[in-house]
UniProtKB/Swiss-Prot annotation:
Disruption phenotype: Results in loss of mitochondrial DNA. Causes a significant slow growth phenotype under normal growth conditions (glucose) and a reduced chronological life-span (CLS). Growth on a non-fermentable carbon source (gylcerol) is absent. PANTHER family: RIBOSOME-RELEASING FACTOR 2, MITOCHONDRIAL, TRANSLATION ELONGATION FACTOR G-RELATED. Present with 1733 molecules/cell in log phase SD medium. HAMAP family: mEF_G_2. It comes from Saccharomyces cerevisiae (strain ATCC 204508 / S288c). GO terms for molecular function: GTP binding; GTPase activity. Its main location: mitochondrion. Residues 39-327 form the tr-type G domain. This is Ribosome-releasing factor 2, mitochondrial. Keywords: GTP-binding, Mitochondrion, Nucleotide-binding, Protein biosynthesis, Transit peptide. GTP binds at residues 48-55, 113-117, 165-168. It is found in: Mitochondrion. One of its GO terms (cellular component) is cytosol.
């Protein structure tokens, strides 16, 4: 009976007494994750709203895995994953950090801790591109918050585990948070929560209050408590009384949920368990939970208090027990849908049935003060060897690799190879100028210089679909203090946007003004800090401003260039529309612009030019980006949602050695096409935000009047907060589901009684309302103080980017006047 618990934390020292089992010195000796078989690898991301406890939970994971000898603390600024000075001084995660560590001596976990602040959404987007599954951390006091809803939608296809954190805090409610989870994410779907463990409260001898001290393990029917004086000590007890009753009800509910989807468990329940819920083996339950989690039919739910070191080891167990390995996860999305892909249990993802084809994605670039530029990559198929010749199928460049590393947040471990499913780092002078975020790398798995043996037309043209970059919504002007500082400013800006592609630079050719654009005020504040303090740029900044764009509402004339030496190009610009037949589309940066190339007859024949098609394509893309940044005729803002169409009759001289002339020709054609377009064919666009407001019912009238009048908002819905969050029921019965999910009620404490009484009073006199609206960003930049005044400090709001929309005629002159 006790063996299972002893094995749960490998390498632990065990003391057994008559009534309890103590597991001491939890953790495991460090093992190189490079040696773990694919089936034992887990690529996970930690996602949540800001301040839910992502970094605190990650630091406990690293401590219990044996990576760190002390527990890092966000408040004291000594965390491993938040290693940037700005992160430690502000106590928030700014950029995603990757780290690899072992668990239970046999599993390797590659973890990416992502930011929770909405301004750093791109860090979450690119992390989701390379992970196989997620751990969603929820605040037990706040429940499901706005950014949690956003990252849940972004990670829709990824298997998930939910960890309800901060169960030790005043006002924490497991019941409320699980109900919130169901009502906001699972209503209208077939997905259900499965409570893997539930909170355990111990009554204090000097009061009537109950204190959160551990969890009840529903699968194994044990109580786990943590010693507050010793972070390494876990006490495992048998259940009795209320704990046993709650566990039995949760186990019955768990089995009822699992058997709706799992026929194997149904058979085990009826035959081997003889219809007795208590006789269903933990082994069968774990297997069923794993199977259904990977199919996104269920979401395992656990709880704890990471700051108090409670519940982290069971969470790590759930990660390796329930989440998929790289050979069980989603296949990567390739540009060529005809290329066969499948999973091989030995080598992982097999592309084009070629075991020697190695494909990797560069998803992040950082600049280390000692090592220089470092590129984070995810290996999807094959094996990457140090010293290999690699082909960048995005740029058409070929180069030799230097060192390979496995990341450990601020540090890294050198390795000779990276295998399918791993996340690693590339360093060295050869990669610095040859790889950018979103590039696909291809090489031969066993030969150092084996590119010639790969299929040139098929395998060397493969690309993993690019990482989506949301458009910036704020900008700040930047200029060097003196003319001599201009070059260093440009170099620093280039480093900045290479590391973070959600930042962009635009330049007004008429005024010479340079503008740094970003996702929000905090995003730009961090970027400015990094420019001045880390990259030592001697610059001055202007005022924060909304990032307006321009677009065209009709197609331009077709402009043509033809020369005697063999160059010919014809192009036009048109508003974005549905995909054009017999054309290929390539994204152009962050402004929803595209290059559309009609298929050229030369593509299906033997390539006759000295330079690769990728080199020609990248020159055209570069000229398109420059041409569109020049701006429109309303206020010279960069162009948005435009397509540049290259006609199929283009040609270049067969003996062309560099694509430099192509860049010049196409750029001039773009300038001419835009210059010939009449001013009335341009529209001004502004960022529109989704606004979520929570306010007392008594303030709805005044808030709505302000929104629709002064702020030009479009109201989408108004509903009771209780209709999207059911707090207090012991069961949740979703209309779409046939069974009732048992959720234990929260322990009755003086605090909860007071809170419940207050909530009852509020419900009877001042119901909370949730208003959803769309509003121009310009009209809401100073909304915090206004809402505080309108709601007497009782209102809360969150905003996130929705889209770019045409500025209405009644507001156009006002906006232009303020520029």
């Amino acid at each position: 009976m006790w063996k299972w618990n002893v094995r749960r934390w490998a390498g632990a020292r065990v003391n057994i007494s008559k009534n309890r089992l103590s597991v001491i010195n939890v953790g495991s000796r460090y093992l190189s994750t490079a040696r773990s078989p694919l089936s034992k690898v887990r690529n996970i991301g930690i996602i949540a709203h800001i301040d839910a406890g992502k970094t605190t939970t990650t630091e406990r994971m690293l401590y219990y895995a044996g990576i760190s000898k002390h527990i890092g603390d966000v408040d004291t600024g000594d965390t491993i994953t938040d290693f940037l000075e700005q992160e430690r001084s502000r106590g928030i995660t700014i950029q995603s950090a990757a780290i690899s560590f072992p668990w239970r001596n046999t599993f390797a976990i590659n973890l990416i801790d992502t930011p929770g602040h909405i301004d750093f959404t791109f860090e979450v987007i690119r992390a989701l591109k390379v992970i196989d599954s997620c751990v969603v951390i929820l605040d037990a006091v706040a429940g499901v918050e706005a950014q949690t809803e956003k990252v849940w939608k972004q990670s829709k296809s990824k298997p998930k585990i939910c960890f309800i954190n901060k169960m030790d805090r005043m006002g924490a409610s497991f019941n409320h948070t699980v109900n919130d989870l169901i009502n906001k994410f699972m209503r209208g779907t077939t997905t259900k929560p499965v409570l893997v463990n539930i909170p355990y409260y111990r009554k204090q001898p000097t009061s009537n209050d109950y204190v959160f001290q551990g969890v009840i393990d529903v699968v194994n029917g044990k109580r786990l408590t943590w010693n507050p004086e010793n972070p390494d000590e876990i006490i495992v007890d048998e259940l009795d009384g209320t704990s046993l009753e709650q566990c039995n009800r949760c186990r019955e509910s768990m089995i009822e949920t699992l058997t709706e989807y799992d026929e194997d468990l149904v058979q085990h329940f009826l035959e081997e368990a003889e219809g007795d819920y208590s006789k269903v083996s933990a082994q069968f339950l774990n297997a069923s939970i794993r199977k259904l989690t990977m199919k996104n039919m269920i979401v395992p739910v656990l709880c704890g208090a990471s700051f108090k070191n409670i519940g982290v080891q069971p969470l790590l167990d759930a990660i390796v027990n329930y989440l998929p390995s790289p050979i069980e996860a989603e296949l990567p999305e390739l540009n060529d849908k005809t290329v066969p892909m499948k999973y091989d249990p030995k080598v992982g993802c097999l592309v084009n049935n070629n075991k020697n084809l190695c494909i990797a994605l560069a998803f992040k670039v950082i600049t280390d003060p000692i090592r220089g530029k470092q590129i984070f990559i995810r290996i999807y198929s094959g094996t990457l060897n140090s010293g290999n010749t690699v082909y960048n199928s995005t740029t058409g460049e070929k180069f030799k690799l230097g060192k390979l590393l496995i990341p450990h947040a601020g540090t890294s471990q050198p390795v000779n190879i990276l295998t399918a499913g791993q996340i690693g780092l590339l360093t060295g002078s050869t990669v610095e100028n040859n790889i950018s975020t979103g590039d696909t790398l291809i090489t031969h798995s066993s030969k150092k210089d084996g590119l010639k043996s790969l299929d040139k037309k098929k395998e060397l043209t493969l690309k993993i679909n690019s990482i989506f970059i949301p458009p910036p919504v704020f900008g700040v002007s930047i200029e060097p203090r003196t003319l001599s500082n201009k070059k260093s400013m440009e170099e620093a800006l280039n480093t900045l946007i290479t590391e973070d592609p959600s930042l962009s630079i635009s330049q007004n050719d008429e005024t010479g003004q340079t503008v740094l654009n970003g996702m929000g005020e905090l995003h730009l504040e961090i970027a400015k800090d990094r420019l001045v303090n880390d990259l030592k740029a001697d610059v001055e900044f202007g005022q924060l401003m909304v990032s307006y764009k321009e677009t065209i509402n009709s197609e331009t004339n077709i402009e043509t260039y033809e020369s005697d030496d063999g160059y010919r190009f014809s192009l036009s610009l048109l508003p974005n529309s549905d995909a054009l037949p017999n054309c290929l589309a390539y994204p152009l940066g962050v402004n929803e612009n595209f290059l559309i190339m009609e298929k050229n007859g030369n593509w299906d024949k033997e390539w006759k030019y000295q330079v690769s098609f990728e080199s020609i394509l990248n020159s055209i893309i570069a000229s398109c980006i420059v041409g569109l940044q020049r701006g429109g005729k309303i206020a010279n803002f960069p162009l948005y949602a435009c397509s540049i169409k290259i006609n199929s009759d283009w040609s270049v001289p067969p003996d062309i050695e560099t694509p430099q002339e192509i860049l010049k020709i196409t750029r001039n054609l773009i300038f001419k096409a835009l210059n010939d377009l009449k001013p009335e064919k341009y529209n001004l666009l502004e960022p529109i935000m989704n606004l979520d407001l929570t306010i007392p019912q008594s303030d709805v009238g005044t808030v709505l009047q302000d929104l629709t009048g002064a702020r030009k908002a479009q109201i989408l819905s108004i509903e009771d907060e209780s209709s999207v969050s059911n707090s207090g029921a012991s069961t949740c019965n979703s209309p779409e589901n046939s069974n009732r999910i048992y959720i234990p009620s929260d322990a009755v404490t003086t605090l909860h009684a007071t809170k419940d009484k207050k909530n009852t009073q509020e419900t009877s006199s001042n119901v909370k309302k949730i208003i959803k609206a769309k509003v121009p960003l310009r009209e809401i930049t100073t909304y915090t103080n206004k809402l505080r005044s309108l709601s007497q400090g009782r209102g809360e709001f969150n905003i996130e980017y929705s889209d770019m929309e045409k500025v209405t005629n009644d507001r156009l002159q006002s906006i232009l006047h303020d520029l």
